[in-house]
């Protein structure tokens, strides 16, 4: 069973009496397709997984997270500040120079007389701290220069991998950049202030709370999330330890409809011979909706983002 499949073969067979072991490959492919369709229709994941996301403070008392139910919160940080500066000072040789933060490290690109050179040797694994990253960049030559901002004994010891922020949508592997560095400084930022005054609700949001020592709180009674663009970074775990039965049944029924469609012309909705007629559920009734019985089971689990700017 694939890690992304909402049900396994055994569960699917409960809705497919009469299938044989030789059908397993086809059924398994349908389980994968229907599981993906359920996730997209509900606009959410169901399996527990870790999230590392940035949010816009909106001046409200609640900060709505994208995934729920929340199982735990690792950290809530705010105030992104520059912690590492990268520059390419050899403007005579290099006509272009850029830095990009990726999942594995820094990508440093320079173009000299039309020749592109890309260096990916500065990895988080080999350089676990910001100081180590700066030293590795400085050792490259070719005009590359980097320095830790502020107290080297503080930011310099921060984990370099924290520079990377996974995209909240899609399968991208870059976050900051590409930022120009030719003759000017590219500032790489981190959310470095740990928020103490918060509480989390399993239903999918954070609340501001005591203590009142956080600088962002102007007044003790002003328990809101200050307005800003990507001014909060939240690391948390969300999902269902066990996939809800209704979601499993919805996936199984969708698989059964897809399977039965392979036993006839899938575009055939009904057939009548003299006084005998038969009508089938169709995969093509509404391109925007799953079959009605599937939609009814999934209705309580759909994510609605109306009224939030968090996506």
Name each region found by the language model:
Residues 81-196:
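Extended, beta-strand-rich, solvent-exposed assembly scaffolds of outer structural proteins
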Residues 1, 60-67, 117-124, 285:
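Short aromatic-glycine motifs in intrinsically disordered, low-complexity regions
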Residues 2-81, 251, 275:
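Glycine-enriched, solvent-exposed interface loops adjoining structured elements
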């Amino acid at each position: 069973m694939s890690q992304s499949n909402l049900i396994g073969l055994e569960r699917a067979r409960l809705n497919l009496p009469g299938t044989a072991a030789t059908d397993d490959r086809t059924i398994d492919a349908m389980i994968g397709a229907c599981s993906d369709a359920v996730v997209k229709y509900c606009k959410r994941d169901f399996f527990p997984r870790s999230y590392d996301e940035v949010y816009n403070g909106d001046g409200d008392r609640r900060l709505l997270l994208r995934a729920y139910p929340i199982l735990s919160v690792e950290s809530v940080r705010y105030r992104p500040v520059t912690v590492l500066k990268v520059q390419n000072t050899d403007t005579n040789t290099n006509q272009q120079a850029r830095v990009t933060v990726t999942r594995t490290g820094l990508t440093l690109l320079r173009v000299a007389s039309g020749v592109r050179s890309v260096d990916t040797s500065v990895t988080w694994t080999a350089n676990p701290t910001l100081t180590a990253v700066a030293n590795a960049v400085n050792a490259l030559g070719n005009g590359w220069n980097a320095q830790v901002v502020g107290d080297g004994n503080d930011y310099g010891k921060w984990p370099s991998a924290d520079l990377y922020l996974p995209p909240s949508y899609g399968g991208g592997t870059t976050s900051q950049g590409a930022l120009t560095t030719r003759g000017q400084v590219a500032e790489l930022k981190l959310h470095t202030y740990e928020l103490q005054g918060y509480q989390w609700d399993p239903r999918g949001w954070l609340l501001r709370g005591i203590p009142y020592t956080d600088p962002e709180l102007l007044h003790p009674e002003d328990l809101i999330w200050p307005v800003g663009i990507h001014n909060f970074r939240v690391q948390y775990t969300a999902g269902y330890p066990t996939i809800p039965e209704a979601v499993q049944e919805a996936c199984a029924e969708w698989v059964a409809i897809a399977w039965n469609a392979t036993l006839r012309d899938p575009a055939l909705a009904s057939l009548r011979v003299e006084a005998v007629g038969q009508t089938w559920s169709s995969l093509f009734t509404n391109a925007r909706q799953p079959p009605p019985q599937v939609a009814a089971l999934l209705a309580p689990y759909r994510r609605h983002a109306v009224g939030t700017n968090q996506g």
